[in-house]
Every structure is written in structure tokens, then in C-alpha cells.
């Protein structure tokens, strides 16, 4: 599954992307 995190540079994007990285379903993570 591909996931895109909008606003990854902001305060909410970083912890959110960390959570998604730990999730086994997520294979590709794109940050914008």
C-alpha cells in the first residue's frame, strides 16, 4: 500500500509518518 503524507514538514506530519512507517501494511511512504 502506498501512503502520501501531506504537510510532512509540519508538526503533525512527522509523528504521523513515523506511525505509518511502523505499520506493516504500508510499503511505500511519500512525504509532501
From Swiss-Prot:
EC identifiers of the protein: 1.1.1.37
Coiled coil, from the record: none
Subunit-level organization: Homooctamer.
Species for this entry: Nitzschia alba
Enzyme class of the recorded protein, top EC level: oxidoreductase
UniProt similarity note: Belongs to the LDH/MDH superfamily. MDH type 1 family.
Annotated GO MF terms: L-malate dehydrogenase (NAD+) activity
Origin superkingdom: Eukaryota
Catalysed reactions, as listed in the record: (S)-malate + NAD(+) = oxaloacetate + NADH + H(+)
Keywords: NAD, Oxidoreductase, Tricarboxylic acid cycle
InterPro entries reported for this sequence: NAD(P)-bd_dom_sf
An individual GO BP term: tricarboxylic acid cycle
Designated name of the protein: Malate dehydrogenase
Amino acid at each position: 500500500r502506498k501512503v502520501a503524507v501531506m504537510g510532512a514538514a509540519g508538526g503533525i506530519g512527522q509523528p504521523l509518518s513515523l506511525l505509518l512507517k511502523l505499520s506493516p501494511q504500508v510499503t511505500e511512504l511519500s512525504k509532501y
